[in-house]
Amino acid sequence: MRAQRGLILLLLLLAVFCSTAVSLTCYHCFQPVVSSCNMNSTCSPDQDSCLYAVAGMQVYQRCWKQSDCHGEIIMDQLEETKLKFRCCQFNLCNKSDGSLGKTPLLGTSVLVAILNLCFLSHL
């Protein structure tokens, strides 16, 4: 019984140390939309996600706290009044890939295709 407790304690300690030893790496740039970001930084332990945000013609890429990944908080921190953003939690996931704002367009296209199929099947 004592050996099991010791093993469990050891596994818990290893889990804690392993999770804190590995830091997230994010792209870190503030630039116009047309530029591409090649700089990256290792996030501090309290920053557990990467942020990619676009406000007008400006792009923000940096480490961020997942718990602060809300539009109002991001706008306040970046001093912007309107933006599109995404947060992600794996290394260099905040690359500028042009995907912001395209999901609704894809959803609309799929919806139109489904509606067309429904109407065509009733003719």
UniProtKB/Swiss-Prot annotation:
Signal peptide, first to last residue: 1-23
Keyword rRNA-binding tagged: no
GO terms under cellular component: cell surface; external side of plasma membrane; plasma membrane
Glycan-linked positions: N40, N94
Subcellular location: Cell membrane; Secreted
Disulfide cross-links: C26-C50, C29-C37, C43-C63, C69-C87, C88-C93
Record's keyword terms, sorted: Cell membrane, Disulfide bond, Glycoprotein, GPI-anchor, Lipoprotein, Membrane, Secreted, Signal
Pro-peptide positions on chain: 97-123
Role summary: Potent inhibitor of the complement membrane attack complex (MAC) action, which protects self-cells from damage during complement activation. Acts by binding to the beta-haipins of C8 (C8A and C8B) components of the assembling MAC, forming an intermolecular beta-sheet that prevents incorporation of the multiple copies of C9 required for complete formation of the osmolytic pore.
Protein name: CD59A glycoprotein
Organism whose genome encodes this protein: Mus musculus
